[in-house]
């Protein structure tokens, strides 16, 4: 099993390095031992045949001026991750949970979302009024939901459709 994961990791690393080379971006691809805990590796498997989702293949791309790989609100990073998953899945004939990060961007972004969630939860608690956050992608909404899941005074729910979907933070007293 360990040698199989090593082989899959090398395939993924090779694909990512080749894509970066084709984009003429000089960067180092560093394998990370385990995926960030709030990353969702079990997204819908494009090939329908999921590998063991407990063994996430994770990389941090390091170098100078890599903002272009992150893009606006991490959209380019999400797209690059998706493309790598598709290519590797095609080569390995199985969907593999692959997580990419650029210079720790996701970690910083997740910490920022968690801080926002707690700040807004305290505001909702004090004002006893629901508060709708700005629309955000599913993986960002998930972080907010997980951050506030055990909050004693508020609960969360998603509302809206498509790109307008957002998290609403609601005082728990409204549910009593």
Language-model segments: residues:
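RNA-contacting regions in translation and RNA-metabolism proteins
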Residues: 1-176
């Amino acid at each position: 099993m360990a040698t199989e994961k090593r082989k899959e990791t090398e395939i993924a690393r090779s694909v990512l390095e080749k894509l970066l080379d084709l984009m003429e971006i000089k960067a180092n691809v560093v394998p990370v031992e385990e995926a960030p805990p709030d990353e969702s590796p079990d997204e819908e498997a494009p090939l329908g045949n999921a590998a063991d989702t407990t063994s996430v293949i994770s990389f941090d791309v390091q170098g100078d001026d890599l903002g272009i790989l992150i893009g606006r609100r991490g959209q380019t990073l999400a797209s690059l991750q998706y493309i790598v998953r598709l290519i590797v899945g095609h080569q390995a004939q199985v969907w593999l949970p692959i997580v990419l990060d650029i210079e720790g961007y996701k970690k910083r972004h997740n910490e920022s979302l968690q801080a926002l969630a707690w700040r807004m939860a305290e505001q909702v608690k004090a004002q006893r009024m629901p508060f709708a956050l700005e629309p955000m992608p599913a993986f960002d909404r998930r972080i907010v939901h997980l951050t506030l899941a055990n909050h004693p005074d508020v609960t969360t729910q998603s509302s809206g459709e498509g790109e307008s979907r957002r998290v609403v933070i609601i005082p728990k007293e409204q549910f009593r």
